Amino acid sequence: MKISTTQIERRFEISSSLVGLIDGSFEIGNLFVIVFVSYFGSKLHRPKLIGIGCFLMGTGSILMALPHFFMGYYRYSKETNIDPSENSTSNLPNCLINQMLSLNRTPSEIIERGCVKESGSHMWIYVFMGNMLRGIGETPIVPLGISYIDDFAKEGHSSLYLGTVNVMGMTGLVFAFMLGSLFAKMYVDIGYVDLSTIRITPKDSRWVGAWWLGFLVSGIVSIISSIPFFFLPLNPNKPQKERKVSLFLHVLKTNDKRNQIANLTNRRKYITKNVTGFFQSLKSILTNPLYVIFVIFTLLHMSSYIASLTYIIKMVEQQYGWSASKTNFLLGVLALPAVAIGMFSGGYIIKKFKLSLVGLAKLAFCSATVHLLSQVLYFFLICESKSVAGLTLTYDGNSPVRSHVDVPLSYCNSECNCDESQWEPVCGNNGITYLSPCLAGCKSSSGNKEPIVFYNCSCVEVIGLQNKNYSAHLGECPRDDACTRKSYVYFVIQVLDAFLCAVGLTSYSVLVIRIVQPELKALAIGFHSMIMRSLGGILVPIYFGALIDTTCMKWSTNSCGARGACRIYNSTYLGRAFFGLKVALIFPVLVLLTVFIFVVRKKSHGKDTKVLENERQVMDEANLEFLNDSEHFVPSAEEQ
């Protein structure tokens, strides 16, 4: 989903905040059934539940792709009502002195001609529902799959199998980014229109790749992969001795269940005790200061990563002019392998140096520090906003403007009868981008000859070039060499940041189970996961998207006159706002980790809390002593 966010935003003409809501619908679906799966999953047929989950994920992916087949062809020139299949400059808005534009129709005519064709504008709801269905389907796959492997693998083999699963998962992510890069190069209506008639390129802010193709492929693969799970046994075949023991245990469990059913009164008391014990356990972890601090700083830390993962493609596109295809490719080839290597290295460091609770917290502190420094460095890699006449400059290109709203026309285009809402950018040979050939004052063009060039552009001429052909070519002006160099530095830092932060984040999975009593590990992990999904996975894309929307300088306008997707952002404000909010999230993480380390040192009383297999009891005793000193009562098994 995150690979295609910019494509979906443009195709459905929606804002970044709404795309963030669609992206978070995966976590919403997950939260709907996570309690059911957590409680009933181990009691039901796990392979079949996993198969159902895969099938639901596949169905959801196909549902997300369906709007493409019902929305009609993508019209990238909606503001000008230009048919994208007609690659003719006669349709492009040139300067028409003393003539009325054919586009100056009454609102009723526009609605009559355009709004009917745009009846699919709300079909993003199907993408929302499909992504939610994917979230529902994903819920049983990981927890039940891991427990199934761990329960029935031969002794000593489960780690190998789980490692293989993790490697395959990371390989799948890399493959997904490669496919995303390929599909982003393909035009959205590939196979339906003559591609030679499409005059925009993947670098154009209106370009929409074949976003639907990725969901269609992944949906079909998920449905096919679900089939084998329905034929897996509830209990895989085991050696004869293990089978006899399992049969004996099964008989005992069956008799125990019969006894429970026979005594309904005792069963009601049993349920009541379990419910009471659950709330007592929940109260215990929520009144544990270490756990509360841990939840807060991990939420803040992960929020920064979620924001990067969701909007990194948009950031790179707007800052450095890279296409989504190029960004996806480099992320898949460089950044994701760096994360995988970092996670492996983090696990090795924890095992090699036998890190204590303080050591684990220090490793997390180093991770957060590196991430904070990288965000600070990004401030120096922000490119200046593009020179766009009518947005950052006056239309004659001579003076900057404080606000891009209601920039007055210049004498060079005041008689051209231009529609200022149009977005058909051209690049003048002075290096300035104009919103349309008309607003550049261009009076003639090269016809259908590629590349399309416009001549006699009066606003370009105003710059004062002597003995030059005052022309402009179709498309925005490219970034300068200095900005291009910054883009390469940015990506190098991004890869290093991904690696070093992955090293530190590995410690979080160990910390969460070391700061609570052993019988509360499952509850602590589950509650932490719920907070990460609800306050991180759902909310972060929404409020970061809303922040990004505030930096938009030019919104598209659909044929009904409503606001669509953003065409161009103020890259300077965008970079400062995006990285500034990330710094605001990460800095408190360092403060809370410092407090965390101080509290652990103060309460541990010099106990050796190293993560050693032969010293696990010593570590647990130290943790229990800390919890008891803090007066955090946890109901015992008998009391529950």
From Swiss-Prot:
**What is the recorded name of this protein?**
Putative solute carrier organic anion transporter family member 1B7
Phosphoserine occurs at: S246, S636
According to the entry, every stretch annotated as the Kazal-like domain falls at 406-461
**In which organism is this protein found?**
Homo sapiens (Human)
Q: What lineage is this protein's organism placed in?
A: Eukaryota, Metazoa, Chordata, Craniata, Vertebrata
**How does the protein's chain sit in the membrane according to the entry?**
Multi-pass membrane protein
- List where the protein spans the membrane: 17-37, 50-70, 124-144, 160-180, 212-232, 293-313, 330-350, 363-383, 493-513, 522-542, 578-598
Q: Which terms under GO biological process does the entry name?
A: bile acid and bile salt transport; sodium-independent organic anion transport
Taken from the UniProt record, the cysteine pairs bridged by disulfide bonds within this chain are C412-C442, C418-C438, C427-C459
The UniProt keyword set, sorted, is:
Cell membrane, Disulfide bond, Membrane, Phosphoprotein, Protease inhibitor, Serine protease inhibitor, Transmembrane, Transmembrane helix
Q: Which Pfam families match?
A: Kazal_2 (PF07648), OATP (PF03137)
Taxonomically, which superkingdom?
Answer: Eukaryota
Of the GO CC terms on this record, one is: basolateral plasma membrane
Entry similarity comment: Belongs to the organo anion transporter (TC 2.A.60) family.
- List the ranges whose topology is Cytoplasmic: 38-49, 145-159, 233-292, 351-362, 514-521, 599-640
Q: What is its main location?
A: membrane
